[in-house]
């Protein structure tokens, strides 16, 4: 499936940021408590989130296996030119670091709700950005 097709399909696109994945794996929240119907949603994350999670120093084999198992249930969105250009625009205009700019751009391009508990992302006002606090 092409990335652009995800933005026009029926249903809700949900993009997990790194904190949202970590806290979900730590069982600090569950999707049903957010009122999210998984059956009617596409669960997505950026390739940057995958890289951040799996490049953690001193990651144990069990942690790595849990992360990979969770990510196997998501659509991991690669970096394409449209996301790249939007991330550059966001990075130039905000105090966000590049990884967060890429995650936000992914969410915007896919017309998705960004799941996070990062106040930098939740308080960001940007055209097309939709966020939901996981707590």
Describe every region a protein language model picked out.
Residues 1-13, 73, 108-135:
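Acidic, PIN/NYN-like endoribonuclease modules and their adjacent C-terminal/linker elements
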Residues 19, 82, 101-102:
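Active-site phosphate/pyrophosphate-handling residues
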